[in-house]
């Protein structure tokens, strides 16, 4: 059984590693796309929207609903990518906790 001091050292080490992984993730860009890639939403790994791009074909004043739907698809796609990357990157720490 580990003594308390070793457990604290291991926990601090894991915390630093986790903070680095979080910083790496925040510095990564994720681009979600709608059907036919007509709308692209780009986020940072900490879920900050940095850009939305609309291809000309999707901009129709007579059909705003399609633009809204495609924008929602692109945003949700990017957020799903971020969630998956977060689980992959930080999920490994759950099993390493010393307690």
UniProtKB/Swiss-Prot annotation:
Keyword terms: Cytoplasm, DNA-binding
Coiled coil location: none
Compartments, record wording: Cytoplasm, Nucleoid
Family annotation (InterPro entries): YbaB-like_sf, YbaB/EbfC
Primary location: cytoplasm
Pfam families xrefs: YbaB_DNA_bd (PF02575)
Transmembrane portions of the chain: none
Complex formation: Homodimer.
Function: Binds to DNA and alters its conformation. May be involved in regulation of gene expression, nucleoid organization and DNA protection.
Family statement: Belongs to the YbaB/EbfC family.
Protein name: Nucleoid-associated protein SZO_16661
